[in-house]
Amino acid sequence: NRDRMVEMREKCSNTPEDSVMERTRQLCEEKQRTEELLHRMLPKTVARKLTQGIGVEPETFEQCTIYFSDIVGFTSMCSESTPLQVVNFLNELYSKFDEIIQGFDVYKVETIGDAYMVVSGLPERTPAHAGNIASLAIELLAAVNNFRISHRPNDTLQLRIGMHTGPVVAGVVGLAMPR
C-alpha cells in the first residue's frame, strides 16, 4: 500500500502545466533542429523566408557564374570498386570540397554522383561572381592534385571543370526535398 501511495503522489505532482511545459520545450527543440537542417540545405536568405512562412518566388539574376565538375574515369572506377568504396571515396572528396568552398562567396547547389555544382552571384548578388568561381576552380584543382583515393592509391584523380557566366533564374523547386 505504501508503494501505491508513493506512486499516486508522484502522479499528482506532475501537474498538467508541467506536462504542457515539457511538450512545449520538446516542440521548440524540434523546431530548432528543423530550421538548422533547412539552413544547411538552402541559402540563408531562402531558408529564413521559408521558416517565416514567406513564399519564395523564382527570381532572375542577370549575372551569375556556375561551376560544374565531374571526375574523369568515374564510371570505370565504379565498375572496378565496391559500392562502399565508391561512397567512401565520394564522401572523402566532397567533404574536402565542402571545406574549401567555405572560404569563397559561393553556394553549393548540389552533388549528384560525381557531379558537383556551385554558383556565385546568387542568392546574394556580387560583381565578383566570375572571379569567385575561377579562384574556387583553381583551389579545387590543387586539392585534387594532392588527393589520394584510399582504395586505389596508384590512380591519379582528374577533374573535368566547366564554368558559365550569364543570366540565371533561381527558385525553390519541390516540397519533399526542396532544391
What are these regions (language model features)?
Residues S69, I100-N132, N146-R179:
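Catalytic core of nucleotidyl cyclases, primarily class III adenylyl/guanylyl cyclases
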